[in-house]
Regions:
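Alpha-helical cap/lid subdomain in secreted, periplasmic
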Residues: 1-157
C-alpha cells in the first residue's frame, strides 16, 4: 500500500488527497492496529509532501455491513488518526446509512449488484456532498465565510 501511495499519489505532488481507506481492511479482516499504523504513516507522508488530505471512511453497503464489527473498528481508528494528524474525515458510511434508514432509499438505488460499489447516482451524490464539505471547510478556514453547519441538509440530489 505504501509503495503505491508514493508512486500514485505523493510523487504527483497533489494539492489535495482524498483518501478512501478502510474498506479493504474490513473485507479482508485485517488487524485494526496494523491498519491504523499504515493509515497514520500514509497521512504523515502525504502531509510531509505538502498536500492537504481528507479521509473517506468505508461505504454503507451489504458486503461492508456483513462485517459490521470490523467496520466500526475501522471507522473509530480513522477518527483517531484524523484527530491526531488534524485532518478531516468525510463520514460516507453515515451519509449512506442515512439515505437508507432515514430517507428510506433502497440500497439497490445507490449500490450495484456486487453489494459493495456505488452506482452512478451514489457516486454523484457522494461527490456533491464531499465537494460541498470541502468548500465549507475552505471557506471557514481561509475566507471567514459563514456556511450552513451541515451542507448535507440543503444539498440533496
Amino acid at each position: 500500500m505504501m509503495k503505491r501511495l508514493q508512486s500514485a499519489v505523493i510523487d504527483r505532488k497533489p494539492d489535495l488527497v482524498i483518501w478512501q481507506v478502510g474498506t479493504n481492511a474490513v473485507l479482508r479482516g485485517l488487524d485494526p492496529g496494523e491498519t491504523a499504523r499504515l493509515v497514520q504513516d500514509g497521512v504523515a507522508r502525504i502531509q510531509s509532501a505538502g498536500s492537504d488530505i481528507v479521509l473517506v471512511d468505508p461505504q454503507y453497503s451489504p458486503r461492508v455491513n456483513e462485517k459490521s464489527e470490523g467496520a466500526g473498528k475501522v471507522m473509530k481508528l480513522l477518527g483517531r488518526v484524523a484527530e491526531l494528524r488534524k485532518v478531516g474525515v468525510f463520514p460516507r458510511f453515515e451519509v449512506m446509512r442515512d439515505w437508507h434508514e432515514r430517507q428510506a432509499i433502497p440500497v439497490e438505488e445507490f449500490i450495484i449488484a456486487d453489494g459493495l460499489h456505488m452506482n452512478d447516482w451514489g457516486y454523484a451524490c457522494f461527490a456533491q456532498l464531499l465537494g460541498d464539505d470541502i468548500i465549507k471547510s475552505v471557506c471557514q478556514i481561509k475566507l471567514g465565510v459563514a456556511v450552513p453547519s451541515d451542507v448535507r441538509t440543503y444539498r440533496p440530489m
